[in-house]
A protein has these predicted regions:
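N-terminal anchoring/stem segment of glycosyltransferases
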Residues: 1-93, 100-104
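Short, solvent-exposed loop/turn segments at secondary-structure junctions
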Residues: 10-13, 67-71, 115-117, 141-143, ...
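Intrinsically disordered, low-complexity boundary segments flanking structured domains
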Residues: 47-51, 119-126, 170-173
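GT-A fold catalytic core of metal-dependent nucleotide-sugar glycosyltransferases
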Residues: 86-155, 185
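Catalytic core and acceptor-binding pocket of nucleotide-sugar-dependent glycosyltransferases
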Residues: 166-191
Length: 191
């Protein structure tokens, strides 16, 4: 069985982390700069921990960065959706890559750049039966049901209600789960 782990690092400007639509007082450029700086400072270590993990469990690892493939994806995305931030484009790009890798690999594991597999972490592919579906963590417990509360555009609550609106607009039932896509495991048949 062919398996791969992949991650993405694109150094997007701090101002693009939240865009102009977030109303949360916590979504500041200063906060985003802390993240950007930490990624730069720990860049080598964040890649190494993933390559070590992949080697230990005997699977391939691929790191995607700001290259021509990403630039082409970003350009097309901005043409069609100019209101989308760089942060959001990366999130769509990781799903695009998940689909692309499923054409070559039987099972695929995506790890956000800040995910750190520990030395004692078990083999993800042996722990999770990906023949049963896509492996993600739901965050329904993080939904705030007080509509007066101000939410970040990236908060689980905003994602929940935005998804409800899209489902209703499409004529579907509005029930949905809030998913953390920082770690995604899937088999090619489910992608």
């Amino acid at each position: 069985m062919k398996r791969i782990i992949y991650s993405i690092y694109v150094d997007i400007p701090a101002a693009e982390h939240y865009g102009t639509t977030s109303k949360s007082k916590h979504d500041t450029t200063e906060k985003a700069e802390i993240t950007v700086d930490a990624f730069k400072e720990h860049y080598d270590r964040l890649i190494k921990c993933k390559t070590v993990y992949a080697d230990r469990i005997g699977v391939s690892f691929k790191m995607y960065e700001y290259d021509n493939q990403y630039k082409e994806f970003e350009t097309k995305f901005k043409e069609n959706y100019p209101e989308v931030t760089g942060y959001e484009i990366i999130n769509f790009y990781k799903l695009h890559l998940l689909n692309e890798l499923s054409q070559t690999y039987d099972e695929v594991l995506y790890l956000d750049f800040d995910v750190i597999p520990m030395n004692h972490s078990p083999n993800f592919f042996e722990e999770w039966d990906l023949s049963k579906g896509i492996c993600v963590v739901e965050q329904n417990d993080k939904i705030v049901h007080h509509v007066e509360a101000s939410q970040s555009i990236r908060s689980p609550t905003a994602k929940y209600y935005n998804c409800q609106a899209m489902l209703l607009d499409g004529g579907y039932h509005p029930n949905n789960d809030v998913i953390n896509t920082g770690i995604i495991g899937a088999s090619a048949e489910h992608i």
